[in-house]
Structure formats: C-alpha cells, structure tokens
C-alpha cells in the first residue's frame, strides 16, 4: 500500500484496556465495556452533538448498499446523515429513510461543501470501481483533515488499493472483507492468519483501525500489537448488504461517544452488529441487514439503561 512518512507521525488511539482475552489470545468484548461506550444522552443536547455524517456511494447498480448504510447510521443514533449518491437512488432513499438528506454525487461543488462540514465520512458502500469514482476518492483524500473520521468500505477500498494515493491525515478506518484485505495487505486468504494480519496492520499510519471481516472478525489498530476477535455472529449473516450495514453502524458510532476513543467505538459497533444478528438467528434461518438496523435502537437503549440482564448471557459473552 502507498502512504507518506508524514502519516506515521499521527498518534494512535488509546489502548482498549477493557477487553478480556479469549482462548486464542485475542481479546473479546465484555458487557461492562459496551456500557462504557453506549451511555445515556445528556438532557441538554441536540442533533449536532451526535455526529454530522456524509455517506458516499450507491452508484449503479448498487443503490441499495448506500441506503442500507444510511439506515444503519440513522438507527445507530447519528445526528445528521447526508448521502451523496446516484440521483436515481434519492427517491428510494427518502422513501425508506426520510430522516436522511441526499444529493447527486456528480455535483462536485456540493460534495466539496459537504466534505468540509462532515465530522465522519463513510465512502464505499455500493461505489463502483470506475474512473469518475477514482477522481472522487482523490478529491476526498485531498480535503479531509486530521479532525475528521474517514471510513473506507467496499468499492473505496478497491479504488484505493489500485491507486497510487497517499493516505490523508484523517482518523482512518478500513472495513475489508477477506478479498479486500488481500488487496490492502498482500495476504491471500490462506495467509490471513492472526500473526500475519497483525504485522500487516503495522504498515498503516499509526492509529488506523482495521475491521478484518470474516468468519471470526478481527479488529486491529496500527501501533498496537494486540487485536480483538468477535465470538458472536455466524453464517446467517452471509447475505448481501451485511457489510454495508456494519459500515453504517461504525459511522454512526464514530460520530458519538467522545468519552472513549475511535478504536473503542468501532469495536463495540462491530460487536453489536453481530450480537444482534446472533440473537435474531434464534428465530430466523437468514438474518437480513435491514432487520438488524431496526433492532439497533432497542439494544442501545438496553445497554445505556444497564438493562442488559434481560438479554441472554451467551449473546454477549
């Protein structure tokens, strides 16, 4: 991968000290730690306190991807969500999610304005690998700052891996599935072991968060040797849009919960995504991503109110 030496100077997120180890030596999320992230909202707060998000993607024929990401972001509590997408998707977006704003991705002037306003930018769900999108990714890289969170998912990962771009001075999150991780790390599927992935993560700018999606999803950050591995989730999640929904949840959490670091927010969002799916699988052969999104507010309410005793222990331990 390509990055500048300047990127290496950026400080990483603080240690995720409130995780317990599993049998493989990786760490796992404990109930108490989820409650440290998902806290009750202050009485005197407004939508601007909970993240201004810009989601970019949904080029033809992948309009559903960006809509599912937006659904997850809004249901995760994001304060303001704006979607830059193919104009053919806007009617469907507003039909499914009137809470979100949307505009034509081809309107580069408006896109630039929205990039400057956003605190969290998610690019990639349903983003086709095309020349015009290569230019859009370059535009984003040139404009984002160290104060912004930039999440690269799906098509944005492939576009970046095929480019010669230097990574920007933003707070970076990558959410690759196994083939996308191969493009980023150079590790084929058989080589994506715990140890080799750990070493590959260190090639990214310090503080970069990597969600290495797979049968046993791992979460890493550059600058720390230890990673975290999910012990929830399963094959009932193997359906289109699951990763888009996860990316939207991560974006939603990234815009909130300043009492903990970005790494913590990403890890808990990733965990909650699979924990909800596991619970739903008790009554469903396949769990749809949009069904997960509908459940997010209920689960966040339980955690923030310390009511998780109503949820079966095995779902979260």
Outline where the language-model segments fall.
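Small-residue (G/A/S/T)-rich helix-start motifs and N-terminal tracts that mark the onset
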Residues: 2-149, 158-170, 178, 182-317
């Amino acid at each position: 991968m390509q990055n500048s030496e300047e990127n290496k100077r950026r400080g990483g997120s603080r240690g995720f000290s409130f995780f317990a180890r599993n049998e493989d030596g990786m760490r796992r999320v404990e109930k108490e730690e989820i409650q440290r992230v998902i806290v009750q909202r202050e009485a005197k707060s407004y939508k601007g306190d909970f993240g201004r998000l810009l989601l970019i993607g949904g080029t033809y024929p992948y309009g559903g991807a960006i809509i599912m990401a937006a659904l997850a972001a809004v249901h995760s509590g994001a304060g303001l969500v704006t979607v830059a997408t193919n104009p053919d998707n806007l009617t469907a977006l507003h039909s499914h999610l009137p809470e979100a704003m949307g505009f034509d991705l081809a309107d580069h002037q408006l896109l630039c304005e929205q990039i400057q306003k956003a605190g969290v930018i998610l690019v990639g769900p349903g983003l086709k690998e095309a020349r015009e999108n290569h230019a859009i990714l370059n535009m984003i890289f040139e404009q984002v700052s160290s104060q912004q969170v930039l999440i690269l998912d799906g098509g944005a990962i492939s576009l970046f891996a095929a480019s010669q771009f230097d990574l920007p001075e933003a707070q970076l999150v990558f959410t690759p599935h196994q083939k996308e991780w191969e493009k980023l790390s150079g590790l084929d599927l058989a080589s994506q072991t715990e140890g080799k992935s750990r070493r590959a993560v260190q090639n990214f700018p310090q503080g970069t968060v990597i969600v290495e999606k797979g049968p046993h999803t791992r979460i890493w950050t550059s600058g720390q040797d230890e990673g975290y591995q999910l012990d929830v989730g399963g094959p009932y999640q193997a359906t289109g849009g699951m990763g888009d929904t996860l990316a939207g949840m991560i974006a939603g959490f990234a815009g909130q919960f300043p009492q903990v670091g970005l790494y913590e927010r990403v890890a808990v969002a990733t965990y909650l995504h699979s924990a909800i799916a596991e619970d739903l699988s008790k009554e469903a052969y396949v769990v749809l991503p949009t069904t997960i999104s509908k459940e997010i507010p209920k689960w966040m309410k339980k955690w923030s109110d310390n009511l998780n005793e109503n949820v079966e222990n095995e779902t979260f331990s």
